[in-house]
UniProtKB/Swiss-Prot annotation:
Keyword Cell division appears in the UniProt entry: yes
Keyword DNA-binding: yes
Function summary: Involved in cell division and chromosome segregation.
Taxonomic path: Bacteria, Bacillati, Actinomycetota, Actinomycetes, Frankiales
Listed InterPro entries: Homing_endonucl, Sporu_reg_WhiA_N_dom, Sporulation_regulator_WhiA, Sporulation_regulator_WhiA_C, WhiA_LAGLIDADG_dom
Record family assignment: Belongs to the WhiA family.
Organism: Parafrankia sp. (strain EAN1pec)
Entry's Gene Ontology BP terms: cell division; regulation of sporulation
Protein name listed in UniProt: Probable cell division protein WhiA
Source organism, top-level taxon: Bacteria
Keywords for this protein: Cell cycle, Cell division, DNA-binding
NCBIfam families the record matches: DNA_bind_WhiA (TIGR00647)
Amino acid sequence: MTATVKDELSRLRVAKPCCRRAEMAAMLRFAGGLHIVGGRIVVEAELDTGATARRLRREIAEVFGFPSSVAVLAAGGLRRSVRYIVRVERDGEQLARSTGLLDQRGRPVRGLPPQVVTGSACDAAAAWRGAFLAHGSLTEPGRSCSMEVTSPGPEAALALVGAARRMGVQAKSRDVRGVDRVVVRDGDAIGALLTKIGAHDSLMAWEERRMRREVRATANRLANFDDANLRRSARAAVAAGARVQAAMRILGDDAPDHLLAAGRLRLEHAQASLEELGALADPPLTKDAVAGRIRRLLALADKRANALGIPNTEASVSPELFENA
């Protein structure tokens, strides 16, 4: 869903100047860098969508009045997709100072500028919006759902973690194979963060997919539960049938007719429930009455088996019976 979120954020209009500055500062910090070209400082930002590049150029022009250029790098080699390079050359140093990429002494700022780090909650949201547009990703809802931003260094990552904390969202900074990442994994936290940065339509789509997945997961759990119950019922029916068959072999005709009739019903309708067996009886019986008669039949047979010194009905229930149950 990364492209969906970035497309929506690229079209979002922000009115407050402090928020526009914070967003640009984060976007340039997470997507760009400072270069010395011909003795002058040049600001560059490498972005993955044309809409994001257009947004950055528009903001630089409207907020600071600086012109910029854009170069398109086609996919190929190590580049898996088209990249857009936004470059400010003539006014690069002024832009770097204005956005906090350089401090008052002209030294590069490794994290986010102080005015963003100590700013209000709206500045924190703007910084996250800029960082996500620059180098963010959002995975589909699921067990491993995450909202991530790849950071240029640990200082910028920690600054972004702090910005999330000011919005009441828990984010973590992690070093993954030498690359600093800021990660939000909790589904509710991701939803809150999408709301804060202004991705409301994307949030609705993400929550809908999340809900669909939860419904499917619940349905699967219930299906598995039903399957387990069916397997248990099948195994119980197989065991009951085997014991009844053994009981009738042990007793022969030396058992009350009503008990033998219940046993025959069990053997003739092996998969039927006790309630169904009761309905098949003549006259009809309750399921408790059927269960009681079968129980007495088995007890009578076990008593006879013990007296004769032969295996009782439980001995007829072997593991082989359950191979297909």
